[in-house]
Design a protein with these regions (language model features):
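Active-site metal-binding motif and surrounding structural segment of the metallo-beta-lactamase
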Residues: 48-94
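C-terminal regulatory/interaction regions
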Residues: 226-267
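Short, glycine/acidic-enriched loop or turn micro-motifs at the edges of active sites
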Residues: 45-46, 75, 161, 223
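Metallo-beta-lactamase
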Residues: 6, 91-218, 223-227, 237
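Active-site neighborhood of phospho(di)ester-bond hydrolases with catalytic His/Asp-centered motifs
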Residues: 41-43, 65-73, 93-97, 154-158, ...
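Short, flexible loop segments at the rims of nucleotide/cofactor-binding pockets, characterized by
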Residues: 16-22, 44-46, 69-72, 130-136, ...
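Conserved beta-strand hairpin/beta-sheet module of binuclear metal-dependent hydrolase folds
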Residues: 2-57, 145-148, 152-158
Length: 267
C-alpha cells in the first residue's frame, strides 16, 4: 500500500498502485468517508489484505464503520470484502442487486445487512445522501457509481481510471500521460466500447455531465477535480480509437519479469 491522502474534505484515499509491467502502474484505490457514520467505498485489492487493513486502521478503527459500499464484485474492488465485513460487524453492505447475487454468502450477506443500490435512486447513509448511477464505462454489468451530495464527489468505479507511468496522487485530464493511460485502460477493460452506439453512449455520459461533480474519484485513478466535462468529452472519443491488443504468451512472460522487477505480483 502507498501513503494515504485526502482527496477532498473528509474523503481519504487508501492508495495502492499495482505494477503492470511495461504499461506502468494501475491505481487500485478505496475511499474512506469520515463522519458520524463512516463509509468505506471499495475494499481494496485481494492481494493487499494486511496492508489495506493497516492503512484503514491508521485512519479509523474498522469497527466504527457503518457502511461498506462496493461498485461491483471484481476482486480489485471487493477483494477484501469478507475481511472488512468481519472487522466491521455493525457495517451494512451497499451494492447492486446483481452484485449481491454474485457474492451472496449466508453468513455475511444476510438481508438485514444489505442495502440495494439501484441506478436512478438515492440512498441515505447516515448523514450522507448517495445518488446511484450506472457509470458510462464498466466491465461488470453489476456496476454502480455513487454521487456523494455532501462533497460533490463521484465514486466512478472503472470509469475515468487509467494506467500511470509512476505512482501519483494527482491527475489532470489535459496531461497526455493521463489521456494515454486512460485510453489504454478503458479500451482494454471495456472492449464493448468499440461497438457501442454513439447516441446511447452519449446519454450515459450526459448523466455525469448533469451531475457536474466537483471531484471524480475513480477506483483506478487519482482524484480529478473540476474536470467532469472534459473527462466526458475524452470518453466520448474512445469508441473511435483502436481496440487494445492484449499480449500473447511470449509477451506475457516478458511482462512477468518486468513486474517482478517493479515489485508486483508474478501471477
Amino acid at each position: 500500500m502507498d501513503e494515504s491522502y485526502t482527496a477532498v474534505d473528509d474523503v481519504v484515499v487508501l492508495s495502492y498502485h499495482e505494477p503492470a509491467g511495461p504499461l506502468g502502474f494501475l491505481p487500485t484505490h478505496a475511499y474512506l468517508i469520515k463522519g458520524r457514520e463512516p463509509i468505506l467505498v471499495e475494499t481494496g485489492l485481494y492481494t493487499q489484505t494486511a496492508g489495506f487493513l493497516a492503512a484503514l486502521r491508521a485512519e479509523i478503527d474498522p469497527a466504527e464503520l457503518r457502511w461498506i459500499a462496493i461498485t461491483h464484485e471484481d476482486l480489485d474492488h471487493a477483494g477484501n470484502l469478507e475481511a472488512m465485513l468481519r472487522a466491521a460487524p455493525r457495517a451494512r453492505l451497499v451494492l447492486s442487486f446483481l452484485a449481491m447475487l454474485k457474492i451472496a454468502r449466508p453468513d455475511l450477506t444476510t438481508p438485514d445487512r444489505v442495502l440495494i443500490a439501484t441506478p436512478g435512486q438515492a440512498l441515505t447513509l447516515g448523514e450522507r445522501r448517495f445518488g446511484v448511477i450506472r457509470p458510462p464505462v464498466f466491465d461488470s454489468s453489476a456496476t454502480v457509481g455513487y454521487y456523494d451530495e455532501t462533497t460533490g464527489s463521484l465514486f466512478s468505479a472503472d470509469s475515468f481510471g487509467g494506467l500511470v507511468p509512476a505512482p501519483t496522487s494527482t491527475a489532470d485530464v489535459r496531461d497526455p500521460a493521463y489521456l494515454d493511460g486512460s485510453t489504454i485502460f478503458m479500451s482494454a477493460n471495456s472492449a464493448w466500447l468499440h461497438d457501442v452506439a454513439p447516441a446511447g453512449f452519449r446519454r450515459a455520459l450526459d448523466v455525469v455531465r448533469g451531475l457536474r461533480p466537483e471531484v471524480v474519484l475513480p477506483t483506478h485513478g487519482a482524484p480529478l477535480k473540476g474536470e467532469s466535462g472534459a473527462l466526458c468529452d475524452h470518453l466520448e472519443k474512445l469508441p473511435g480509437t483502436e481496440p487494445f491488443r492484449f499480449p500473447d504468451d511470449a509477451a506475457f512472460r516478458v511482462m512477468l519479469e518486468q513486474m517482478k522487477a517493479q515489485g508486483g505480483r508474478a501471477a
